[in-house]
Amino acid sequence: MYIDKFKNKGYIFLEDPKTWPKDWISLIEKNRELIINYLDEDAAILEECNKLKESGRESENKYDVENSFSKKIGRFTKTFKALILSTNQQILCYHATRLMDYEVELIKQNGLKKCSLELRKEKIDNLLEYNIINKYEYEILSNKENNPLVLRPKRLNNTDLIWGYNTFDINDYEDCAYFLNDYGGEMIDQASFSNELKVKLQKASKPYIIICIDKISLFAVKSNKSENEYFENIIKPYINNDEIKFLNFQLKNIDSLPIHDVVKYDLWNE
């Protein structure tokens, strides 16, 4: 794998606990029992709620209350966040996407930027300028108000990046390979447009892995739920599976993420 050459170079890979600083692991392990109790109680509450709902006795739900371990988990995740922010190591993030040739240089020069309607329009304009689509197809892609199939600047549920989607561990062949094989453009939903249009966009682009680099502070999102994100995206998967092979997390509140490399990556012809 291409990313193997970065192993043991002092980088942190969030999907690979073997690269995490020892104090991260130590803090998580010290609180393992608390975390497991929290997860178990959460699962029990959800199961009971579902049973009441299925039996038509939803009004009897006495579990619409906070998990009794929530406050302790909150204190733990705040401590974990502080530990992350004190970490000086850098992390590498991978973004699986399809790019046209001109976009590769743009990304290298400008970094991975947040999506905006202006940037989205610019990309659709370029498709027309490069004769990849015709005027009719241009209208289909551009007419967001009248065509509900045109997506907002969003793909694969919850991303807000112009060139990258949710961060994939590129070892996750089932999801990543499917994505790189089937999706032809950043703004195209697989089921939304004609096969002809999708094929055009697919042929115009090539699969790439964008390797981004930044300080861990990119996780310091200004949100009341920020501590929960650490728990849901890092700690919970670790507790559930020590051998994490796929960890999905979101990059938020960034203006531009520096690029370490943009690599043409063909999962079928490595």
Region spans (language model):
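N-terminal, charge-rich interaction modules
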Residues: T77, C93-T97
